[in-house]
Amino acid sequence: CAGTIGRINHEIFSLQHTEILELEEPFFMGKVGSSTMPHKRNPAVLENVLALCRNVRSIAPSIVESMVSENERDWGCFLSEWEAIPRACHMFGAALQKSKYILENLIVYEKHMERNLNAQKGLMMSECVMMHLARKLGRLTAHEIVYKSCMKAYEQEVPLKQILMQTPEVTQAFTEEEVDLMLNPHSYIGLAPEFVDRVVAKWENI
């Protein structure tokens, strides 16, 4: 459990980096991130949760060690568990409480997500283009064509669409509108909405 909660919070922590900033822990006016740099909005609560979860996980080895005991009653094991288990529960309880606060008040930056999706100027959608082209030219041929197009777009620092529209195999197979659709991240989310609905429905029934 401490691993799962830790990972969730670490993901939010990573996505709060200034250059990414897709998510942010709850913020309110008056919350100070630094005594010397007034602009800072540090992930203090997230850091607290990560430390708590790390400490809980560090207790696991001592509890595992208690599995080896002398016959049926080994007070050396009992005393170790009496100290380790309550300490782990207290810290994990605090981690859960803080995580609940974070998730219920999480700040989501949709515009930043959109910006990050388009940061590579379409390269992220190369799989979608390749899979569509594979239906017409075969998987290996399509992969080679899209690979070369991507490397050219990367090296020239231009949008992938610009290179694709200069590639005969692509323009013979698709219209410009179809290429635009394939390069649109919103059209390539698969079953993600269904998975989200399933998880939410399961949670509501708990």
What positions do the PLM features span?
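Catalytic-core signal marking the mid-to-C-terminal active-site face
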Residues: 35-206
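Acidic, glycine-rich loop-and-beta core segments that form the ion-binding/anion-interacting portion
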Residues: 1-57
